[in-house]
């Protein structure tokens, strides 16, 4: 019965995930306006009053705090990206400066009301939520700013394990989109391959099952598995990895070797071979074996020089005309080797023969 309920929770949770993405542009544009306006207030305060003490400012700012002169200075930077230190909170809104300026022009009187009479209030809440009704407070959604799931039960939104669709906007369904490992309308159940570690009125804590478990489990160790995935076998100690490479039928193609992995295995080519388009292991002419102590072209030159020295020694010793001819041939060969032999001109077969 409990498994049936869990399955239903998963299905319901999956349905709740399929929600239209909310851009919430009007609300975010309003908050962009507020942010640039607030930066303007800070900038003018720094320019004219560097005291930093609220009581001092109330006493000494005089009429400038709500003067038309200051408002004009503030409005010069409103709706400009350059007014903010970064735009991270407003990414993805096309033509945000134009849209912000449109809001500013449309609601100029409301913004002036805030400046002259409402500066003691939070501007974002007063303007965007209460007056223009473009946003909702955090934890609320929709046209009437209804509470997101969880708040009515004095818990966090979606019991702290998900996000509320439309949170903070005048849009959305209010359904919870659960974090990985959680499911259900309120994200109060553990998803498949997760188990319930603890539960309180504030929510549930779920942890992932052991990697060898198939489906539900009771703890994070392999002993908590009720069934095992392919590549694992159920033992007294729980799910244990199966070494498929012990099976002679694994990796039977020519030049293949079996490599055991956790829960599976893979077939790789022996050293000096590589897979072709048909996944067969073929001789790799480009394979790089252990490099010799001396480059191959230098080896050939050393052989040529050594041969020359040996021949000259015999020529001097015997004084034979034939050896004089061989000496001449060797000198010509040595010159050709020195001029034309390099790693690019040496055939692949010769490289492999010399271990290069």
Curated annotation (Swiss-Prot):
Q: What is the effect of changing residue 30 to A?
A: In kr302; substrate-trapping mutant. Reduced sensitivity to the nicotinic acetylcholine receptor (nAChR) agonist levamisole
InterPro entries, sorted: DUF3456, EGF-like_Ca-bd_dom, EGF-like_dom, EGF-type_Asp/Asn_hydroxyl_site, EGF_Ca-bd_CS, Growth_fac_rcpt_cys_sf, LE_dom, NOTCH1_EGF-like
Q: Which cysteines are joined by disulfide bonds?
A: 27-30, 158-176, 178-187, 245-258, 251-267, 269-281
What EC number(s) does its UniProt record assign? 5.3.4.1
Q: Which GO terms describe its biological process?
A: IRE1-mediated unfolded protein response
**Family matches, as Gene3D superfamilies:** Laminin
Is the Nucleotide-binding keyword given for this protein?
A: no
Topological domains on the Lumenal side lie at 18-299, 342-356
Q: Name one GO cellular component term.
A: endoplasmic reticulum lumen
* Domain of life of the source: Eukaryota
Tissue expression: Isoforms a: Widely expressed in tissues including body wall muscles, neurons, pharynx, hypodermis, seam cells, intestine and gonad. Isoform b: Widely expressed in tissues including body wall muscles, neurons, pharynx, hypodermis, seam cells, intestine and gonad.
A molecular function (GO) term: calcium ion binding
Tell me where the sequence motif CXXC sits in this chain. Answer: 27-30
| Ribosomal protein as UniProt keyword | no
The UniProt keyword set, sorted, is: Calcium, Disulfide bond, EGF-like domain, Endoplasmic reticulum, Glycoprotein, Isomerase, Membrane, Redox-active center, Repeat, Signal, Transmembrane, Transmembrane helix
The EC class name is isomerase
The record's annotation in Pfam families points to: DUF3456, EGF_CA
Catalyzed reaction equations: Catalyzes the rearrangement of -S-S- bonds in proteins
As given in the record, the signal peptide range reads 1-17
- Listed transmembrane segments: 300-317, 322-341
Q: Which residues are glycosylated?
A: 122, 247
Q: Which residues lie on this side of the membrane: Cytoplasmic?
A: 318-321
Role summary: Protein disulfide isomerase which associates with the unc-29 subunit of levamisole-sensitive nicotinic acetylcholine receptors (L-nAChR) to promote L-nAChR assembly in the endoplasmic reticulum at neuromuscular junctions.
How does this polypeptide assemble, per the annotation?
Interacts with unc-29.
Family classification: Belongs to the CRELD family.
Can you say what this protein is called? Protein disulfide isomerase crld-1
């Amino acid at each position: 019965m409990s498994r049936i309920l869990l399955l239903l929770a998963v299905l319901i949770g999956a349905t709740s995930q399929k929600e239209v993405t909310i851009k919430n542009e009007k609300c975010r544009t309003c908050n962009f306006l507020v942010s640039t306006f607030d930066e303007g207030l800070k900038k003018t305060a720094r320019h004219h009053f560097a005291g930093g003490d609220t009581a001092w400012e109330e006493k000494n700012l005089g009429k400038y705090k709500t003067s038309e002169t200051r408002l004009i200075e503030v409005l010069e930077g409103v709706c400009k990206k350059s007014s903010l230190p970064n735009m991270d909170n407003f990414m993805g809104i096309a033509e945000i400066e134009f849209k912000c300026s449109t809001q500013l022009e449309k609601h100029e009187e409301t913004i002036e009301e805030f400046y002259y009479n409402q500066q003691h209030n939070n501007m974002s809440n007063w303007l965007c939520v209460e007056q223009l009704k473009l946003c909702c407070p955090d934890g609320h959604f929709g046209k009437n700013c209804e509470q997101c799931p969880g708040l009515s039960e004095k818990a966090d939104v979606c019991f702290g394990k998900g996000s509320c669709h439309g949170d903070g906007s005048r849009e959305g369904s209010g359904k919870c989109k659960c974090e990985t490992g959680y499911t259900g309308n309120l994200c109060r159940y553990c998803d498949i391959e997760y188990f319930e570690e603890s539960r309180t009125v504030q929510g549930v804590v779920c942890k992932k099952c052991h990697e060898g478990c198939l489906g539900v489990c009771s703890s994070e160790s392999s002993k908590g598995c009720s069934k095992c995935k392919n590549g694992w076998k159920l033992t007294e100690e729980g799910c244990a990895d199966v070494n498929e490479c012990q099976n002679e039928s694994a990796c039977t193609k020519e030049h293949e070797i079996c490599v055991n992995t956790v829960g599976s295995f893979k077939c790789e080519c022996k050293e000096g071979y590589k897979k072709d388009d048909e996944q067969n292991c073929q001789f790799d002419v480009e394979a790089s074996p252990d490099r010799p102590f001396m480059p191959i072209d230098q080896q050939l030159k050393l052989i040529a020089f050594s041969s020359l020295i040996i021949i000259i020694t015999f020529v001097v010793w015997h004084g034979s005309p034939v050896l004089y001819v061989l000496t001449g041939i060797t000198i010509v060969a040595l010159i050709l080797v020195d001029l034309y032999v390099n790693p690019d001109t040496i055939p692949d077969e010769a490289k492999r023969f010399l271990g290069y």
